[in-house]
Structures are given as structure tokens and as C-alpha cells.
Amino acid sequence: MSVRRPQFSTTERVIKAVPFPPTRRLTLKEVFENGKPKMDLLKNHLVKEGRVEEEVALKIINDGAAILKQEKTMIEVEAPITVCGDVHGQFFDLMKLFEVGGSPSNTRYLFLGDYVDRGYFSIECVLYLWSLKINHPKTLFLLRGNHECRHLTEYFTFKQECRIKYSEMVYDACMHTFDCLPLAALLNQQFLCVHGGMSPEITCLEDIRKLDRFSEPPAFGPVCDLLWSDPLEDYGSEKTLEHYTHNTVRGCSYFFSYPAVCEFLQNNSLLSIIRAHEAQDAGYRMYRKNQATGFPSLITIFSAPNYLDVYNNKAAVLKYENNVMNIRQFNCSPHPYWLPNFMDVFTWSLPFVGEKVTEMLVNILNICSDEEMNVTDEEGATTGRKEVIKNKIRAIGKMARVFTVLREESENVLTLKGLTPTGTLPLGVLSGGKQTIETAKQEAAEEREAIRGFTIAHRIRSFEEARGLDRINERMPPRKEASYHHDAGRMHSHSHPPHPQASRRTDHGKKAL
């Protein structure tokens, strides 16, 4: 018995029309009422890919910064509360998160950082979350992630996104407000909530309270560790006695061990550490239980489903109420498509157009036969038309081959862009032709410790495969010659001193963000 396969039309579009984003930007008078943003209006406008006037964006960001600046470096929050992990510019999934977790008007929220970069709707996430903070300053809380800084937002996508959608002034305002974000939260006097993890320089909660957070995070030290550190890959079954080892995946900070966490929890009378920072296939992970309490010593929560549109992971939020902890998972939502690195469709289509135009020119020049090109003039001298036309054909033919390479490699270029942290191709790749592109692709795959059997042309089908290819993006990017300055003019060193407690180790950490 034959199985009938569904028939698809080859002459009609599956989706016949796409709504055009609103062209008019919302004004200050429209967005604000009694000094607070109108959340329903803003949400509906942003979901349609609408934008606001620059003065509206600046007011939301600066008003949010004023509230965040008044909060302590380690805030104290009470249950019931919903704890959320990385968002990474996935605005349409953030809307799904609030559907799953509950309306912010009657639900308490704690976000653990990484609101921007990698996704293409980061500024929408900032504007919406900061508007919620203005409306609910005592029930919605925001912590800093490792991506809320100048160094990473310049290296990845957020700075470019701000320039394209708004201006560099909006980006600078975001950097100022990121400097105001708290670094940790003490939940119900039971849980320490941070973005990354622990630090050998932090042995008690008071060490966190004393930290100066109002600056660009340095490349090392306790602030860096709170934002960047990870649990060991073999957390809970370590083969080393070291509490902290150098984080070879990040290129900065540390891996921390199960004994280090248990010791910290015991010394500070805590149940567990709740953190984000690493993608999880199920959206969360409960680590080995603390033998003294029977409760998981460490919990990772991740709230960006189908991360980068290739991970195929679920997202999750953690709801804590009446001493009961529940995990709610959710899948990704449809979202508008952006070409990599915010490329416009004209730039993307140039190789295709160029190939066809050069083909047409070659065909026009080839109309002349050999006999026509050998015609002599009245004085009997052979014209130079034959050589001139042949030279033109050769030149245009060479150009045609370049466009053909570009056209054939368009999809591969997209793939290579996705595997490079800056979203740009290595210098000289295109001028070297197809073979150079193939070589660059293979080098990219090797550099990222791609899993065995992976080829660039084939589609990424699993969480582990995506994580292996994206490993290079887990590292702290190389720093520029100039150090970053914060508002008071202090400078931070861009070198990383040797870790006194770091042993030589090649553990590979999990996917991180």
C-alpha cells in the first residue's frame, strides 16, 4: 500500500503576504503616561517591529538606570518569584516567557542577565524589560550578565544593532545603564542568584556587597568571576582536589567544583546557587545534591529557546513559591528573519545579479563571428577590433567567474558567518576564490572543535552539534589596545594575570553564552 505524500504548489507562495513594520515611531507623549511607559502600547508596537523616537528610547533607558543605581550590588528578593536565565535578544521568545511565567503586573520576576547580543532583537528586549522595571521597580529585578558590557557588545551584535535601529547615543546610554545593574541576588535568604558562578575571592556574602559594580567589568577578579565562571564538566564527580581551576573554555575566570560550592553554601547557610550563562538542552539543569541538605547544590536556568535558531533546545523558567520549586519549559516562537550581521538584501543579492549581468555581457560580445572581427578597412590595414573584443571578453569572463564563485558560495558564506564571532569573513577569503573559502570553512570548523563527521554543508540537527560549533563564541574576545573607561575615568587592565590556584587542566566546559 503506497503512502500518499502531501502535495505542495510550486506556483503559489505558502505565505502570500508579510505585514510591513510600522513606519511611524512612537513619540514621548504617546508612550509615557504619568511618567511611566504604557506597556500594552509598547508591546504591541515592538511585536510588529515598530520603533520609538530616540528621545523615548533614551528616557526609558535613563529612567531605568536611575532605579537600578539605587539598588544594592547584591539585592534581596522574596518568594514567590520566577527566575529567568539568558534572553540574548530573542524578543519574541521573551514574550512567550511572560505568557508561561505570568504577567509582570501580578508576578515577581528575577532575570539573571544576558539580555543582549547574538539575537537580532536585543534593543527591543532592553526597552521592554527596562519599561517593566520602571512600572514595577519592587517586583521585577534585573542582574548583570557577562554580555552587558562594552567589550562584548562591540565584538558581537548589539552595538551594530543600536546603530542600525537607533543611534550610538542610545548604545552609550545602554552601556551606562548596564554599569548600574546589580551583580547578585539573595533569594528568600536561601539561594544565591548570579549570572555566572563563584569566585575564589568571594567566601561570604559580604564580599559581594562590598564590590564596586559601577564600571566596565574587568578581565579578572571577583566581578569577572561572578559573570564568567562555570561549574566543572565533571561537577559532582571530580577527579581533582582543586576547588578552582582555570576556565579553558572561556579563556578567563574559573571552573568551580562541587566541594567549593558545598563549602560556600555551608559557610553562608544557603541551600543552593542559581545561575544562568550556559545553554541547556532542556532549558535547565539540576546538579548533584548537597549531602548536608539533600537539595541540588547548583541549578542552571536558560531562557532562550532554539538558541541562535540552531540549538533546538527548550527554554525554562524557575518558579519558587511556598518552599516548592517548579520548572516550566517552553519552545521557541516564530520571529522575523534578519540576514547575518544585519546585512541588507541588496548586498546579499549582488552576487546573483552580478553573475547574470556578466553572463549577458559575455554573450553580447560573443555575437561577433571570427569573420566579422577579421574585416579590413579601406586602406587594407587589419583592424584591431578582434584583439580588443577578445580582451574585453577575457576581462568580463574573469569577472563572471568571480561572481559565480560568490553566487555558488553564498550559502557557505552565511554558514561561515555563523561560525565566526564577529560575523565577518576572514580577510582575503573572497579574493582567494572558492578554494580559499573552502579552506577557511574547514579551519573554522577545526578551530571550533567541531564534532566528528560534521561538514559545513549539512544542517545542524542536534544541541551537541550546535554547541560544538559555537564553542569559539564562549570565550572572552580579545581586547583592543585601549582599555575601557567608565564614567569616573578609571581604567581596567586588559591583561589576565596567572591564576594562583589554577592547575593545568583541559576540561571542556558546557555551552556558554
From Swiss-Prot:
Its cofactor is Fe(3+); Zn(2+). It holds the Pfam family Metallophos. SMART domains: PP2Ac. The keyword Disulfide bond does not apply. Residues 472-513 are annotated as: Disordered. Fe cation binds at D86, H88, D114. One of its GO terms (molecular function) is calmodulin binding. GO terms for biological process: calcineurin-mediated signaling; negative regulation of calcium ion import across plasma membrane; penetration of zona pellucida; positive regulation of calcineurin-NFAT signaling cascade; positive regulation of calcium ion import across plasma membrane. Expressed in osteoblasts and bone marrow (at protein level). Expressed in the testis. Expressed in the sperm midpiece in a SPATA33-dependent manner (at protein level). A motif (SAPNY motif) lies at residues 303-307. Residues 400-407 are annotated as: Autoinhibitory segment. Zn(2+) binds at D114, N146, H195, H277. Residues 458-480 are annotated as: Autoinhibitory domain. Binds 1 Fe(3+) ion per subunit. InterPro entries: Calcineurin-like_PHP_ApaH, Metallo-depent_PP-like, MPP_PP2B, PP2B, Ser/Thr-sp_prot-phosphatase. Its main location: mitochondrion. It is an enzyme of class 3 (hydrolase). PANTHER family: SERINE/THREONINE-PROTEIN PHOSPHATASE 2B CATALYTIC SUBUNIT 1-RELATED. The autoinhibitory domain prevents access to the catalytic site. Calcium-dependent, calmodulin-stimulated protein phosphatase which plays an essential role in the transduction of intracellular Ca(2+)-mediated signals. Dephosphorylates and activates transcription factor NFATC1. Dephosphorylates and inactivates transcription factor ELK1. Dephosphorylates DARPP32. Belongs to the PPP phosphatase family. PP-2B subfamily. This is Serine/threonine-protein phosphatase 2B catalytic subunit gamma isoform. It comes from Mus musculus (Mouse).
